[in-house]
A protein has these predicted regions:
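N-terminal beta-strand motif that seeds the catalytic metal site of vicinal oxygen chelate
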Residues: 4-18, 204-229, 263-270
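Core segments of cupin and vicinal oxygen chelate
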Residues: 28, 45-47, 216-254, 284, ...
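Glycine-rich phosphate-binding active-site loops on the catalytic face of alpha/beta enzymes
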Residues: 90-96, 129-139, 173-196
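Vicinal oxygen chelate
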Residues: 252-258, 283-320
Length: 320
């Protein structure tokens, strides 16, 4: 994927916004950015959309902007000129698709059938929009279509919310979802920016699904590791499962290293729904990663260590 689509994938959730006033543009986008979502699909459902895109692009250059509900060639041109990095439509219009692609833009046409998706792919659309997602069969439908259209990638909007977001993002051909649950129109009208920031943070946390995987404890040698494992197992009535380089206790809650491993005292594994997205979002919070430790499988990162220890423990992210 190109760099814009890579960033869409990393961010994962793209807020969909219909501005009522240009005055809402900057404070809303700042609230989203503060909540960890530096992206927006600004819909052409309102007259001020073009002006809002231009203002955000000029004042918040780190905000990834898409234009949504683009129905005509003229709207597409105006959106791209204003600073939109990608164009989204509710339906599949070959004329608009071809025009945007011919101008070097990124087009995500709305599709609901495999026929529309195939036509869009053949026109050069790398990612298509699945809309309205829930009303059209949701992720189960896409899994059936994806078995045939293996190179098709989707951004899903329409009925996506905090309860089902990971059902969508858990399918590897879906690069992102769009939604409004973190920036409802009533909150925007009320100027409830702090609430929007809080809901955006919660959306990111739900998406990442960070949780403790296991604790690794360094030992000097195999004998010390065996003794440590037996001690923990007896205290907690857990099973011991010896391995080549370590001994697991319980359901792998503890990993006892047979020789000193990474970290002064050991390591802590944090599980996540998507390591690549976690790297992006935690980096925005100031976390630094040891990129040489990255473990990649089938094009996706499955594990990576933080650059710095915490209280003598190395920390690594691990794919669930």
């Amino acid at each position: 994927m190109n760099s814009v689509l890579e960033r869409v994938y990393e961010i994962g959730i793209i807020p969909v916004i219909a501005f009522n006033s240009v005055d809402e543009a900057i404070p809303l986008c700042k609230a989203l950015m503060d909540g960890g979502l530096p992206a927006a699909e600004v819909t052409f459902r309102t007259a001020c959309a073009e002006e809002c895109i231009k203002k955000i692009h000029e004042e918040l250059p780190n905000m990834l902007l898409g234009a949504g509900t683009v129905l005509t060639v003229d709207q597409a041109d105006r959106a791209m000129a204003a600073g939109a990095s990608f164009i989204v439509a509710p339906g599949f219009d070959p004329e608009v698709c071809k025009h945007v692609i011919d101008k070097g833009g990124i087009m995500m046409p709305g599709t609901a059938t495999s026929g529309e998706m195939q036509q869009a792919m053949n026109m050069g659309c790398e990612v298509v929009k699945f809309f309205p997602a829930e009303a059209n069969g949701g992720v189960d439908k896409l899994k059936n279509i994806g078995a045939a259209l293996k190179t098709c990638k989707w951004m899903c909007t329409g009925g996506v919310n905090a309860k089902n977001v990971n059902n969508y993002l858990g399918y590897n051909q879906i690069i992102a979802v769009g939604g409004t649950w973190m920036c409802k129109s009533d909150k925007i009208k009320a100027g409830a920016w702090d609430e929007i920031t809080a809901m955006s943070k919660e959306a990111v946390n739900v998406m990442l699904g960070l949780e403790l995987g296991h604790i690794g404890i360094n030992c000097a040698d195999e004998a010390e590791a065996a003794k440590t494992a037996e001690t923990i197992a007896s205290l907690l009535s857990m099973a011991v499962k010896p391995g080549n380089s370590s001994i697991f206790v319980g359901k792998k809650e503890f990993e006892i290293m047979k020789k000193p491993g990474r970290g002064t005292h050991g390591h802590i594994a944090i599980l996540t729904n998507n390591v690549d997205r976690a790297i992006y979002h935690l980096s925005q919070r100031g976390v630094k990663f040891d990129m040489d430790s990255k473990n990649v499988k089938d094009g996706k990162t499955i594990a990576i260590y933080f650059a710095d220890e915490v209280a003598g423990f190395a920390i690594h992210l691990v794919q669930k």
